[in-house]
Amino acid sequence: MGKIRLSEPRRNSDGLDWDDRVRDRISKLQPNEIGYQQVKKVIINGVAQQLKDHETILEVVLSKPILPKSKVMIDLQFEAQVPLQVRRSGRDNKEGIRYSMSQWYPKMVEYDYQGWNANPYIAREFYGVWGDYDVNITIQKDYLVAAGGDLLNPAETGFGYPGSNDASKKSTGNTITWKWQAYNVHDFVWAADPQYKIITRTLANGPLVRVVYKQIDSLEANWQRLADSMVSAYPIIARTFGAYPYKTYTFIQGGDGGMEYPMATLIKSASIGTAIHEWMHSWFQMMMGTNESLYAWMDEGFTDYATNRVMSEMRRETGFYFTNSYRSYLNLAKSGYEEPASTHSDHYNTNYAYSSAAYGKGAVFLAQLGYIVSDSLLNKILLAYYNTWRFKHPNPNDFIRVAEKESGMELDWYKEYFINSTKTIDYSVGDVNMKDGKALITLKRVGKMPMPVDVLITFKDGSKEMHTIPLNLMYGNKPAESSIPWFTETEWKWTHPEYAFSTNRSVKEIKSIEIDPSMRMADINRVNNRLIIPD
């Protein structure tokens, strides 16, 4: 991995923008500890093809074009060495897991409307092709194998899988072949360890959930709690984001931390928050199949939004769920390191800018969309997005079009400002005067990004009014979101830095005026959002 020297090192940094999970560990590996894949042959319909090696990308020079909708048989022969665990795939990680087998085979590059997506692999994001996997894993018989798929021969393998017995202990020979199947997925992950233990939960109207972990008595209760938590999480997930379409999902202790794959994830420990996050990737990466290299915010950000929402509902929390996401984005916006969230994942100047944009700003994009169109319409958008685009590789325009259809508003401006630029939001309460016996309130747009504006007026007698000011670029307005008196004002033209509106009461009756009391608008300076009228 590369490194960038920052002019102002962030907290917990030595001045180098390392990925702390990698740093210089790869350079210190011995020859028998490095990982590699060496493709020996690619044979198509019986004909060997010319190969060009570009490090992590293998180019196959076809002897004959493969035409659209035609079928070919590809025989790919390769050798690989399993590395000492550093990132993603490997053996003997810090938790003592013997094999964490992700990125373990040559994976087909996705060809879409933009052509080939041949991004060199630098242990960040990847974009794959859906297919049907039939995988046979032959390994010493004392190993339990976990994988993202359905086990076809549990009676032969044993180890507590549903339908299994102690056949593995009675079998002759030193090895057993585990037969796995995963259909309509774009990757396949597995892990193996002789001290693995498995527990299962069957979710109502949902999948069979497996939790596979290294047996340590002191941690047993943690893994049981993780399994139990999925029972309460799934109804929230399905109701909000759509049903999980596969028969099984497996949480596997392994790898170097949370990393998502179809039908399974690798996690280090029994963190319920991490587990929920990785499972939610099944909606925004595994089912949608968005090009995560180009649109990481559509996967990591939407997944972070979903994680916060599901965890908060599980805990029966009320109020604002997304404080950490907003804090992450606002810190980035003020740091001087921000780049547009539309930047390719591999080409950010700093890891900090990438992670804060992909996770924090991506989550804020959804939460703030609820502010623009209303949370009730956002809920409809999320389900419509799932129903319209699962298994179809959507891009940002596809999501925006769904949001526009469900809300009846124009929203391309929102993507262009918030994702394609680094312009920030800052609104302030300006002057308050009397005109024709009514209070005339002036608002100012200080930042460069225009937004619709909600204004709460609290009166000295305790009564309140909410005034929502649509942005003219929306060509519409959101419905009322509360039971207090709700007034929709005339639209605010995006070219105008100031806007004024009236309330039917006098200035002396007003106690305070506050912009965006819900805190959903990502205003970089909330100090000027509230004005208290002195007695």
Q: Can you annotate each of these PLM segments?
A:
Residues R23-G96, E491-K508, S518:
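A surface-exposed beta-strand-loop module
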Residues L151-P154, I199, D217, M280, ...:
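Non-catalytic accessory/interaction domains
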Residues P9-R10, D53, L84-N93, A146-G149, ...:
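Short, solvent-exposed loop/turn and secondary-structure capping segments
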Residues G2-R5, P9-R21, E79-Y133, M519-D535:
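Glycine/proline-rich low-complexity spacer/linker segments in large multi-domain proteins
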Residues K107-G115, A123-W279, Y305-N308:
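Hydrophobic helix-coil surface modules that form long, contiguous segments used
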Residues M1-V47, M101-S102, T138, D142-Y143, ...:
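Solvent-exposed beta-hairpin/edge-strand motifs
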Residues M1, S70-L84, Y133-K141, W178-V185, ...:
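Short, hydrophobic/aromatic-enriched beta-strand segments in well-ordered soluble domains
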Residues M1-I4, W180, R210-K444:
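Hydrophobic alpha-helical and helix-loop surface patches within well-folded domains
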